[in-house]
Amino acid sequence: MEDEQINFANKNYKISEKDVREYVLARFQDVKCSKKIKNLVTFQAANKYMIMAHDQVELKNLGNIVASYKKIPFSDILQEYQGHLKIAMVKEPTMKTHTNVIMHIFGYFSKHLSQGEKQLFFEWLEQFRENRIATGNVLSKISPIIYRFNNTYLASQTYFLLYSDVQPRILFNVLNKKNTLGEINLE
């Protein structure tokens, strides 16, 4: 899946899993430079579903590392977090892990949907599982629901930024910044 390209609404723009990893790791580098626990907490929250798509076990480990900030020096937390983040991001997301993430997201608003809307959601999910639509297509269908219920937590998830078909122009402005950063080396 390394070379798999995720298609966006504009077919001229494509993003690879390598681009996803580089983006997340570059944002972590920003956290390291800030040397602030609040930025690490924000990073962890914003990347929860992205990391979950890659490695749910490491997501839990990362959460525990962040939670230990009162017991361990921040520099040690950053070093341990970085190691586990790299492990998580190396693992390729699968249909199963994306489905798990999408179901977790669905849980945020499912009780507010009508039966017809729920049925439509599960039809999208089935199309995704049958490989008839891409991850981005499912997320771009979910995105308006998130805004309808004003769920800022979900709207701020990098999972939507990097996989959704909704706003590829913004994504590529962000990813173009990686070219100015050069190779990202977190060792």
Residue ranges and their predicted role:
Residues 2-187:
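Acidic, Ser/Pro/Thr-rich low-complexity regulatory regions
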